[in-house]
């Protein structure tokens, strides 16, 4: 039991300012508008930042138009979007903080092993936010909720890159 108490304190420390229920609802609602556009989301990231595409061995050096409609691209896009969907679905509930922390920490560890830099995480964030701004109802409240969510996510993931 002591272990879980210590783990909970570590999670709260790492995610010092978890999303409120209202912020989580805003993020979930906006994500629900695009989460089935997996291929378009990943294509937007690759189009904006070809250096990210180059980190994927199965897509490196290939023309985006030639891979966008392939099963491999759709499968990988679905994996990425599903990760976000899982984290978002757990957000806004204090009882889920340790699960969110574990998922996001593993994301950082896995990407460190692949040589992904903090700058590339930042590029992905920029491309994702640009996609969201263009495809969901976007206002100051949505921007603030997403920034809070991504700040928390990146604080944990980037700690694993150190």
Swiss-Prot record:
MF terms (GO), sorted A to Z: heme binding; metal ion binding; oxygen binding; oxygen carrier activity
- Gene Ontology annotations for the cellular component aspect, listed alphabetically: extracellular region; hemoglobin complex
Indicate which residues the UniProt annotation says bind heme b: 76, 111
Listed A to Z, the keywords are: Heme, Iron, Metal-binding, Oxygen transport, Signal, Transport
| Residue intervals of the Globin domain | 18-162
Q: Which InterPro entries match?
A: Erythrocruorin, Globin, Globin-like_sf, Globin/Proto, Mb-like_M
What span is annotated as the signal peptide, if there is one? Answer: 1-16
Stored Pfam families: Globin (PF00042)
* Family the UniProt entry places it in: Belongs to the globin family.
Q: What else is known?
A: There are at least 12 different components in Midge globin.
Oligomeric and partner information: Homodimer.
Write the protein's name: Globin CTT-VIIB-7
Organism, scientific name: Chironomus thummi thummi (Midge)
Q: Which gene encodes it?
A: CTT-7B7
